[in-house]
From Swiss-Prot:
UniProt-listed HAMAP family: Ribosomal_uL15
Subunit annotation: Part of the 50S ribosomal subunit.
Family listed: Belongs to the universal ribosomal protein uL15 family.
Basic and acidic residues: bias regions: 1-13
Chain intervals with Gly residues compositional bias: 21-35
GO annotation, biological process: translation
Keywords assigned: Ribonucleoprotein, Ribosomal protein, RNA-binding, rRNA-binding
GO CC annotations on file: cytosolic large ribosomal subunit
Region (Disordered): 1-40
Name of the protein described by the UniProt record: Large ribosomal subunit protein uL15
One GO MF term attached to the UniProt entry: structural constituent of ribosome
Record gene name: rplO
Length: 169
């Protein structure tokens, strides 16, 4: 037996049934749809339609709203930053900025900024330049001998700042 001769066992796969291909197939003529009526026609399915009964999405009350002023921040835990320093992905002597976190692979891309959270151990002396930081994160960084500076630049201004340009907000 060779790799190019490997096949599925007999009966392991089943061919797709093609409907409407002659009465001898057993699924010809009406193609398994019964006779006439709304459900026999094409394009019958209207999403959420319940035959005239008030549909579920209209029976339930509206709730909440989308805040257009909300800041979409990346959350970064101190434990992940320490792991990146240990792995050599982050330079302990350079300030930890949004750009540095993206290059280290800790965050995929900069959204509206970064919030530093105090989960995990931090032993390296680091200086952070982030959008926000929790109290526990600030305490842990200062205990390790580092510092935290918070700056905020929204949207396009933030992207410009992360590319080396000066943010004017």
């Amino acid at each position: 037996m060779k790799l190019n001769e490997i096949r599925d066992n007999e009966g392991a796969t089943k061919n797709r049934m093609r409907v409407g291909r002659g009465i001898g197939s057993g699924k010809g003529k009406t193609g398994g749809r019964g006779v006439k009526g709304q459900k026999a026609r094409t394009g019958v399915s209207i999403k959420g339609f319940e035959g005239g009964q008030m549909p579920l999405h209209r029976r339930l009350p509206k709730r909440g709203f989308n805040n257009i002023h909300a800041h979409d921040l990346n959350e970064v835990n101190l434990g992940r930053v320490q792991a990146a320093v240990d792995a050599g992905k982050l330079d302990a002597n350079a300030p930890v900025t949004v750009d540095a976190l993206v290059k280290a692979g800790i965050i995929a891309r900069a959204r509206d900024g970064v919030k530093l959270l105090g989960v995990g151990e931090l032993t390296a002396k680091l200086s952070f330049e982030v959008t926000r930081a929790s109290k526990s994160a600030v305490e842990a960084v200062e205990k390790a001998g580092g510092s935290v500076t918070t700056t905020f630049a929204a949207g396009v201004a933030h992207r410009g700042a992360s590319e080396g340009a000066v943010a004017s907000a």
